[in-house]
Structures are given as C-alpha cells and as structure tokens.
Amino acid sequence: MIQQIDAPLREDVRLLGNLLGETLKQHAGQDLFNQIEQIRALAKGARDGQAETEKKLEQLFLDLKDEEILPLTRAFSYFLNFANIAEQYHVVRSRRRSEFDEQGPPPNPLIHLFEKFKQNQISSKQLFQQVSNLSIELVLTAHPTEVSRRTLIQKYDDINEGLSKLDQQKLTPRERQQVLDDLKQLICSAWQTDEIRQNKPTPLDEAKWGFTTIEQTLWNAVPKFVRELDTLVHQHCDAHLPLDISPIRFASWMGGDRDGNPNVTHNVTQEVLWLSRWQAADLYLRDIEDLRWELSIQACSEELSQTLGRRHPEPYREYLRSTRERLKATRQWLSLRLQGLDGDDSQIIRHKQELLDPLLLCHRSLMECNLPEIANGKLLDFIYRVNCFGIELLKLDIRQESGRHRQAISAITEYLGLGNFESWTEQARQNFLIQELQSKRPLLPKYLNEPEGSLIEHPDVKEVFATMRTLAEQPPESLGAYIISMAEYASDVLAVLLLQKEAGILQPLRVVPLFETLKDLDGAAKTMETLFNMHWYKQHIQGKHEVMIGYSDSAKDAGFMSANWAQYRAQEELTAVAKSHGVQLTLFHGRGGSISRGGAPTQQALFSQPPGSISGAIRVTEQGEMIRFKFGLEGVALQNLEIYTAATLEATLLPPPVPKQEWRDLMHQMTDISVRVYRETVRENPHFVQYLRTVTPELELQMLPLGSRPAKRKVSGGIESLRAIPWVFAWTQIRLMLPAWLGTGAAINQVIDENKKAVLDEMLAEWPYFQTLIDMLEMVLSKSDANIALYYESHLTDNEDLKILGEMLRQRLNDAVQTLLSMKGESKLLSKNDVLDQAMQVRKPYLLPLHLLQAELMKRRRLYTAQSNAERTPVDHALMVSIAGIAAGLRNTG
C-alpha cells in the first residue's frame, strides 16, 4: 500500500521510525516496544478493514493503567512528527532532484509561468513593470494551532539537517555512521523532552518565535529568491530589476493583535516593537562584519572617495565603519530600553534609508570600478534584506475589535457633554467624526480629573488611549496596518482615525476594516462606498485602500460553502467599488491552515479569487502551524516565496474567466441550501452544543497551553462565544471535520437531483474558483472518518438524544462523500491525488491508536473531575500529548 510513495521518502520514514524504536527499547524498555509493535500491527489490520483487530485494540486500551498510557501516546505522537519531518525534507530533496532533470518540469513555478506569459503575448515591458511593482506581504500570526514546543522544533530542524547530510553522495562510511549517531542522539533527546509546554506562551514568546523564523530561514531565503527572480527577468525582459526591489515583505500580529486577548497591552506592544528592532540591528551587525571582511578592495569611485574626505587603502571598510557603529549604538539603546533604562539615542538608526544609502553608494562605486562580481555578492544580499526587512524586521499590525473604539469615542463624547456616541444614528456618528477629523484642536485636555465611575476612566478605554499614545512614539516604518475586527460601519473606520489624531500620531497607520460575518461581508462594498463618497476621506487615503476578508468567523457563522461564496462576492463587489472611485485596492486575506479558515494550496487559492481582485498586490496571513510547514526549512521557504509570486503574477496578468450568470445562479441556490442546513443543525438543534462539548475534546482543548489568547471570547454561552479556531480544532480531533462539509454536501446533492449536473460539470471544468472549492472539500473529506467519530461518541455518552444527533451527522458525512464522488464520477476520494492519499494511508496505523487512547483519556478525565472537582488529573499530560499528536498527524489543526 505504501509502495507508491517515493522510495527515498519511504526510507527516511522507516529510518526515523527504527531509530525511535531503538530509543524506546533503550530508555522505556523492551516491554513497551513490544506493546507498541503489537498496537501498530493491529492498527494496520484495522486500516485494511479487519473489524476484529479494532475490537482487540479497544480492549487492550481499556485494560491499561493510567500511567501506562502516557508512553504509548508519546510514542505514536513522535512517529507522526517524524513522518512530517521526512515529508518536509522530501520537498527540498525533490526540488534538488528536479534541478538535475533537464527533461522534467522546472522546480521553480516562475520558469513555466514566464513561458506561459510569452505564449499569451504578454510583452516583456508589461512583465517587467508588473514584477517591479509587485507588493506581496505575508503576515505571521500566532494563532493557537502550533502545538509543538519551540525546543522540539529546533531538534526537528536538526533532524532535517541530518536527513540532508545522508543524501550527500560522497559520505565516507565513518561520516555516514556519525550522521546516524547524531540522528539517534537527537531522537533520544526529543524522547527525553516534555513535548507539552508547562505554561501558555506570552505574546512576547510568540513574537520571538516569529523572529526565529526570520533568522533561521527567511534571512537567507529572501535574497536567494530575489536573485532567482532577477535572473529570470533578465532572461525574459533583457533588464535587471531595480536595486530597491522588494516583491515580498513580512509583517506580524504577534504582540499587536489585542482582539479578544487581554494579555496584549500597550506595554507588551512596546516591548515587542523594541525587541523586533533589536533583532534586526543584531542580524545586520553580523552581516556588516561579514561584508567589511569581504570589502578589502582599494579601487573606489570619486563619489566614495569624496564622501570619505580622504584617500584610504581600504575605503569600503573605512566608509562602513560608521554604519557599523550606528548599528551597535542602535542595538545598545534598544537593549537598555528593554531593561527599562534610558540611553543615548543620538546615533541610532531610525529609518531604513539611513542603512541603505551607504550600501547603495558602495554598490555604485564597485560597479563603476568594473567589479560587478563583488558588487553583486554579499553586498547585494544585504541590500535585498534591508529592502525586505527594514529596520524593524517585521512590521507590526495592530488589531482591535470595533466595539472597543466605539466605547472609547463614547467616553470622549460623554466627557464633552454630548451624550453617548454609541446610541447615535450612523449618520450622526459620521458627521461628528468627520467634523472632528477636520478640526485643528484636540478633543481632550492633557490631564483628566474625572470621578472613578465615569466611562473615560474605564480600564478598557484607558488601554485604547494608551495603545494609541504608544503608537505615536514609534518610527512609522515599524508599524503596519491598524485592523478593525468585526467592522460593520463607515464610522468604525473614522473612529480609529480620530483616536490616532487625538494621540498625536503624525503619520497615521492605514486603517483596515475586517469584514468577517456573513452579514458584514454582504455589506462590505456598501460600507466602503460610503467612505469613498466622503470628500475628506477620499483625500486622506490618496488613492489607496486595504480591506481584510475574514475566513474563520464567516465559516463558523454560515458553514464553509456559504462563507466561501460570500467572500468571493464581497471581493468582486469591493473590487468594482474601488475601481469606480479610482482607488487601488489591496485585499488582505485572513486565511488559516484548515479549509474552513480559507486554507488551500497557495497557487490554487490565489488563482481562484475573482478576476481583477488581485492586481499585483495582496496581503495574506500565515497562521500558527502553517508558518513552520511553509517557512521552517530554507528550501521549503524558497519554494513558497516562488509560489506566492507566481500565483500573484498569474492572477494579475492572466486572470481567471468571469463566471457565467448560470454558474452564479447555481452558487446562490447551493449556498442558500447550505446555510439553511448548517444553521438548522448548529444553531437550532437543542442538543448540538451539548454534543460538541461531550463528544469532542472542546473543553479539554482549553487545558492545552497553545496560544496567549483565551479559547473563548466569553466564559459562558453557546457556539457564538467559541473562537473559530478551537471550534475547527475540536471537530478535527474526532475526525468528523464538520465545519468543512456540513450543508455543502446537501446543497450539491439537491442540485444534482434537480438535473443540474451538466452545469456543475461545466463549473468544475472551467471555473478555478469552483475547482478549488471542490478540491478542498475532497481533501478534508479524505481526512474524515465516521467510524472514529462513532468510537468517541459510544465511549463518551449514553445520552439517546446525543446518539440520534451523532447518527444524523455521520449519515450526512457519508452522504457528502457519496455526493462528491458521484459529481466527479469517481469511485474513491483522492483518486487523482496519490501523494496526499498515500500520506494519509501511512499515518493511519499511528493515528488510530491515538484516537482510541484519546477517547479513553477523555472518559477517565471526566470521571476524575466529576468525583473530585480537581482542575488537574493524572491523565492530563497523556491527553494533551494525544491532542498534539493528532494535530501533527492530520497536518491541519484549526
């Protein structure tokens, strides 16, 4: 069954599995090893359809003592993590292999795409202009689905490095044995490490994790990528890219996203901003030391000589000395600030240009002296890095919920004796905000002396004001966008602009409304039209605007298909409104790893957006565990930078067709059915919330120290109070995957029954948007397993009402699978995606025991808490390991 998987990948999986086995024998005993082998054999039998083997497994787990479960869950969890490592390294290996194969397809998708542009009569001038103006920004967010500890991630990276060494042809037997010994030592060290964090990460921990990704992979991958791009452009357009090119940049929400996270305060934001600049200065200092070592050349231009003011035997080294000293001063000053101390800031670097100008002068001089090899060596890499990472490493976005801003403005209006802003009509709010934005005077005195109970003294209001004052003190280059979550009205955007003005922010952050519920997505274009019609606002934005489309909350609100179509329509309408007002629109996609959070292969996801909606500019969130999968290894990071660039260029220069009216009508019909079925189940079934809390580990997930934010917006309440990410995570753990297919299968089935299969076939053949939607549905259905979901249910509840609901949900899951197969005319899922199918087949013998163990652990934990009311129980650790292991095995968590 595993034969179709690439032999080298199979060998790596086997090697890591064997080394883990040896470690277990040595450190956990032969008995445990034998037990694991027995369980693995039974699980393989169960995978291949032998019903009696699953029964044996169940009995075996029932008989285990509490303390016997932890080593088992750890062993299976580690195997799944090692399979991921092998797969991730295999991407790098395959890429290298394809570079040797001149007959095969090129590893870089841009090579094929540039040929396609030529065939489609895209002129070299048009292509050059488009590449030069590309603006892709990837925004790293710490969504709480990265369940692996950073300590272990480092060991996993070292294991990757070991696999890479084993691939080298010229290792001597002794060298090869040394690599194997190193791998064994790493696996032994991982086994002896607790894979579960003891404490939730702080927002500062999350931010440091983002900086680590930059330092370890992107710092080298970015200049390599820009060089590749420049070579390609030169081949096809006979011109080199401008030196200030930066097609891809990075931003972050870690330490800036305060929506629903009381742990992100203005002090935390300040600390993260300083730390980010410190990290950048530190990395540039290493680079400049390297560069000064290389630039021992005597020959220099008249311009450089005059700037130095004298002749010098090593002009470049001498000239860059002051830049090095300024970087040291910057790092030292930031170090002091992080310790709460003041220091001399007269020499610090405050703007990117202060770092770039000396580098560009050196480059001009070397080119003038006919030394392009040196000019375009380490120096050019340095220039590309400064273009991409600036003085801040990652621009920090700020995100806050619209209600907090309304509350803050209400505090101001109440203080001024104007009443409560929140109770005014929308028109009255807009009038007040525009009037005050045009006024030269401040609204509030510098010092307030109000009684304690007044709104202006409310801690939440004071925190909003304090955050704005903190932003006013930063170099503008350190900051990205100010995002308003749950944006509904034009006044939501104006309110943030007024709060920025009141705090004295001289270069206001661009304000980005985030539309995320079905209702807000449907009203998004109208809201933006209202803003664009305001003379003051139109002048303020200077022809550019950014709007964020939310994926998670809309899918939780309406189901995958309805949310997906609402997002598509909102983008179409926003693109049209912006165009009619002459505004250049950038859409910011709040995607995640799972499909109900917009997760899809990048190229497919971007090409399936509405035509015209990606016009050379895009922002996308990279969330939680996806950061590690996409950027954790330099080779994989490089590939993902190429894919983003190719996808953005293709969607811009060769956009997909405008969907036919017949297709749109059918999508409307299907989404109406889909949202009705979804909400009938999720919102109207009186037993649904109880089912979620009983059968899935939704409540137990809150124990896992995942991200720095609470799993719920409010402590009590139903589905509405649950964050979108734990919502997806919980259903994924029991393999029901409900958010992704509920309602969608029923909708497709109904239109097939109405003899509209021919239209569906046409949509599938000709419309990239619909192809992606169906591919994503198929991928998630292939990871679902009704039998595993039934096992959790039968193990965890005797309630007849819940069993009836569970039966209905599993039936609907099976119906969705059958509907998809009949629509595609295929007999099994993933019949055209062998790689994913095989990856799941390999994982099944390791996932099944973890699921059965998890159900048993949940049962035991609930018994303990019912008996003693204790917060901690003897099975907590094993339960958390099972949650992390299943997340690793399925590769998309929340």
Curated annotation (Swiss-Prot):
One of its GO terms (biological process) is carbon fixation. One of its GO terms (cellular component) is cytosol. It comes from the Bacteria. GO terms for molecular function: magnesium ion binding; phosphoenolpyruvate carboxylase activity. It catalyses: oxaloacetate + phosphate = phosphoenolpyruvate + hydrogencarbonate. The keyword Phosphoprotein does not apply. InterPro entries: PEP_COase, PEP_COase_bac/pln-type, PEP_COase_Lys_AS, PEPCASE_His_AS, Pyrv/PenolPyrv_kinase-like_dom. Its cofactor is Mg(2+). The keyword Magnesium applies. Its EC number is 4.1.1.31. Keywords: Carbon dioxide fixation, Lyase, Magnesium. Disulfide bonds: none annotated. Coiled coil: none annotated. Belongs to the PEPCase type 1 family. PANTHER family: PHOSPHOENOLPYRUVATE CARBOXYLASE. Forms oxaloacetate, a four-carbon dicarboxylic acid source for the tricarboxylic acid cycle. NCBIfam families: PRK00009.1. This is Phosphoenolpyruvate carboxylase.
